[in-house]
Amino acid sequence: MATREQKMKFAIKRFKGFWNQFRRSKRGIFGISIIIIFSFIAIFAPYIAPYPPIDPKYGVGEYQALGLASGKPIATKLSKPIWYKYLPWIPRGEQIIQEKFYTYTGTYYGTTLQFVIPYEKYDPNTTPLLTLEEKNNISVADRLTLSRRVSMIETVEAKLPNGTVKELSDEEWYQEPQRPREIILGPIFPDDTEITVTYKTGVDLVENMKIVTDHKFSTSESLDSWTWSSNYADRIEVSYNAEKGIKLKETDDSGCIQISYKAAGTPPTEPVQVTLSYKFSYPYFQPPERFWVHVSSKSEGISRYYIEASFYNEDSGEKFLLKRAEIYTPSPEYVYKEVDSTEDVVASNVGLSPPQDRIFPTHGNYSFQVTLIFNPSTNVNFYLDHVDCLLYGNIFGLLGTDNTTPYTKDLFSSLIYGSRVSLIVGVLTAIFSTFIGLFLGLIAGYVGGVVDEVIMRFADLLLVLPTLPLFIVLVTALRASSGYISMWNIIFILTFFGWMSFARSVRSMVLSLKERAFIEAAKAAGGTTMHIINRHVIPNVFALVYITLATSVPGAIITEASLSWLGLGDTRLASWGKILYEFNNSGVVTSKGLLEYWFWVFPACIAIAILAAAFILVGYALDEILNPRLRERR
């Protein structure tokens, strides 16, 4: 009998011989390299992906309003990849735009009114011949509505029907501050006068910006970035306090800004105002998509005060009040206030919706300001902490974001984590279905008779069923009964319908093997059925097991992706099929076009194709080595 050491040496020798043959196969090495790369990505996904794949949140444990569980979105919906800013053909910067309109007039109840028709709806050959009613069917706009955001109007020109061109003065047209895209004409022009508006607009790729570097005031140096002013500056002292800040986590520092009012002499005749300013540069020609402001404060010596959040344009000198909040707190506890650009009160205070279009019309220097307003009767102390402002841009991450609500997802993180589901489902389904097929094929081929007939007829029954429609029905039924479908349910279903072809192949090989002389000799020597199967039959069919394992994985990967794409996957896990499902349900294809957001769908499709092809290449390489009819003689 061979010793354990001899068996180990023989196994190592066989593996070395197999590896020497396998490494000579270029497609086999290429395929196994891809599988190793995807396996590495799947194993180390938490370290490679910058965000969780499901409901990623920004600021958890960083702001009082968010606490230790809630968070803000990591980015705006449908953000483009951040590397778009390096593409030379993507337009960026200030652009000069020209838009044309044509006028016509109508008299209603004795009053002459002027209307305009956009250039794209005006036909110089037919429109002038239309009646007033027919022109009204084209457009009844009484003002010029520009298609792009306006940073500055350059000129407004009128070309009369007789060919005379006149540049309108500032007194002959005007804009309402809350509607910068609309121009109202003063004079009434003859019908079919061509109005040309030349204006500047900014087009840019805007990154997320965190305005305040240290919003928790971890060190005293963080106060140096702030400046302050007051209408009673001689009674105000602004300092750093290292003990009375907010501690949401054990690792948090206790720093904060302390604002002290010293009552002295004559009481103030008007409310005391203290404004803290944090200067920053906004480098983009286009406004941010959204902004969010957070301030936490508490008071000692006064229970009622007001707090304002504002932006101040250092270049134009214009101040934009975002929100004013009254704070009434009998006990000296921190109270937080947050401001979101989507709030109606912000648009109302700024005078434009969305408010960021007016606040950040182009690049420039700004200040983020927080103002305390109070009526003191004695000494008062205020403490400010978690003071910050976030500006959301339109580019984010390596692959951008989707449009999931309320927490948009980082597509690169979803792609990385999706490799886990595809590999687990593909490999486990292949292993389970292959070994079930091996077991049933061995039993059917070697035992024969009624057992063979029952197994094969059952396999035939499953083979003739339409698999994908059946998968859909079974998955839907499981979801209806349990409320959700798990990854393990999908593996079970794919395994149940994936063993039949391999079982038939094993059966045919066993039927041939059991007629061989060495099997007859083993029977004559008194070998039991299990001994013959284990020692003589299985080693002769196991080469087919390796090949089937490799070639079965792609089918399972694609089927899982198909089910997830139809919305029948595990919604609690990120998968490549789920990425396709969310893209399909987003409506982006019809509203924006496939090519504009290719980065949402194409990487997942390419990943599925590459991983499936890698297993197929490995399967072909194994077939060349293990199949005697294809094996190269060297």
Can you annotate each of these PLM segments?
Residues Y407-R634:
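Alpha-helical transmembrane segments of integral membrane proteins
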Residues M1-A141, T145-T155, K159-T429, S433, ...:
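Gly/Trp-centered helix-boundary motif
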